[in-house]
């Protein structure tokens, strides 16, 4: 389950259990601890509280934080760490009107709470649950919520870029650097930025550059730069693609190994904004004149609940209309034991 899958999101499929187990109102659930180690236990099938949805899970998506949290925090983070899943609605809680039993959905579970995705049934809030059209498979669906919500938070809540419903006019250029554009979070950021008509997109990637090339629009100045060329070469290529324009916005979906330092060398030192994704770092070496922020998807459960609800609807429509594409997946065999 936790093997490193470069530029692909790992998904796992729970194996069906007997009707006797289901009738007993229990399920199998995977508990992740330091190592990482996975222990399969029997747990009660969760109940939907007010505003919640319980999903019978077909696929669960794995994210790097699923093993990092137990590794860093030990017993405090020993729990069902899964936060991405897809399947059919099993139960809806009080006040939920957008979903009904049997609906095909993808959902993001609230981290550090019971009812995680590494189980036969998982819990999500209605505002982080996405309707899946028939053309989107459950496997694809499990690769969407966590990364897509993170990308939306970065671009619109942190960088305050124009929303897709109010796209930039064709005669206006807003350069945006996306470092880690071939990652799951990065590739959803690219797709969202395009819907906002934000160009040129200056995408930084490595071996998966072809994946990024297929998403961007070269006719609008979009480009992919290989970070393996080194700090100076990347900085020079970013500058060259700006054509003399100031760089105001950057999303660093990697936030390590010199990525944000390279970006900050090119960002405008007076109006530049950068958002990063590793909350444990201080980023104290970023110049104080540059506005920095850290994007955490947990913010959708705090002051961005309606923001998340709006994007849940938008993502569902994007899948239906065909412009939103799931990040490439790799299915790990052996259900949660994989």
Swiss-Prot record:
Example of a GO MF term: oxidoreductase activity, acting on NAD(P)H
Gene3D superfamilies: Medium-chain alcohol dehydrogenases, catalytic domain, NAD(P)-binding Rossmann-like Domain
Enzyme Commission number: 1.-.-.-
Keywords annotated in UniProt: NADP, Nucleotide-binding, Oxidoreductase
Induction or repression: Expression is induced in presence of sodium nitrate, and repressed by glutamine.
Alphabetical list of Pfam families matching this protein: ADH_N
Residues binding substrate: 147-153
CDD domains (alphabetical): enoyl_reductase_like
Residue numbers binding NADP(+): 65-68, 182-185, 205-208, 227, 277-278
Segment forming the signal sequence: none
Coiled-coil regions, chain positions: none
Effects seen without this gene: Leads to an enriched product formation.
UniProt similarity note: Belongs to the zinc-containing alcohol dehydrogenase family.
PANTHER family found in the cross-reference section: HYPOTHETICAL OXIDOREDUCTASE (EUROFUNG) (PTHR45348), OXIDOREDUCTASE, PUTATIVE (AFU_ORTHOLOGUE AFUA_8G01420)-RELATED (PTHR45348:SF5)
Function: Trans-enoyl reductase; part of the gene cluster that mediates the biosynthesis of fusarubins, highly pigmented naphthoquinones responsible for the coloration of the fruiting bodies. The non-reducing polyketide synthase FSR1 is responsible for the condensation of seven acetyl-CoA units to yield a haptaketide. After rings A and B are formed by aldol-type cyclization, the PKS-derived product is released as 6-O-demethylfusarubinaldehyde.
Name this protein carries in UniProt: Trans-enoyl reductase fsr4
Organism: Gibberella fujikuroi (strain CBS 195.34 / IMI 58289 / NRRL A-6831)
Lineage of origin: Eukaryota, Fungi, Dikarya, Ascomycota, Pezizomycotina
């Amino acid at each position: 389950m936790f093997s490193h899958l470069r530029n692909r999101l790992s998904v796992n499929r729970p194996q069906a259990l007997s009707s006797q187990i289901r009738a007993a109102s229990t399920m199998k659930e995977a508990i992740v601890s330091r190592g990482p180690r996975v222990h399969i236990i029997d747990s009660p099938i969760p109940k939907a509280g007010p505003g919640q949805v319980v999903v019978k899970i077909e696929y669960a998506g794995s994210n790097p934080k699923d093993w990092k949290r137990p590794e860093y925090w030990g017993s405090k983070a020993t729990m069902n760490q899964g936060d991405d899943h897809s399947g059919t609605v099993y139960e809806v809680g009080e006040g939920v009107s957008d979903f009904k039993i049997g609906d095909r959905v993808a959902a993001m579970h609230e981290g550090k709470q019971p009812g995680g995705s590494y189980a036969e049934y998982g819990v999500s809030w209605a505002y982080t649950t996405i309707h899946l059209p028939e053309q989107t498979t459950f496997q694809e669906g499990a690769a969407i919520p966590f990364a897509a919500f993170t990308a939306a938070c970065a671009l619109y809540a942190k960088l305050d870029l124009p929303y897709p419903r109010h796209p930039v006019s064709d005669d206006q250029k807003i350069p945006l650097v996306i470092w880690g554009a071939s990652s799951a979070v990065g590739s959803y950021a690219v797709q969202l930025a395009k819907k906002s008509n934000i160009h040129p997109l200056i995408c930084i990637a490595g071996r998966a550059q072809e994946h990024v090339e297929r998403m961007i629009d070269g006719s609008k100045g979009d480009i992919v730069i290989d970070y393996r060329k080194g700090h100076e070469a990347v900085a020079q290529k970013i500058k060259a693609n700006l054509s003399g324009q100031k760089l105001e916005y950057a999303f660093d979906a990697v936030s390590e190994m010199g990525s944000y330092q390279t970006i900050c060398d090119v960002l405008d030192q007076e109006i530049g904004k950068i958002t990063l994704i590793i909350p444990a770092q201080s980023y104290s070496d970023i110049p104080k004149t540059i506005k920095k922020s850290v994007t955490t998807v947990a913010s959708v459960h705090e002051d961005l609940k309606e923001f998340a609800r709006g994007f849940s609807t938008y993502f569902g429509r994007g899948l239906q209309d065909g412009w939103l594409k799931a990040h490439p997946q790799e299915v790990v065999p052996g259900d949660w034991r994989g």
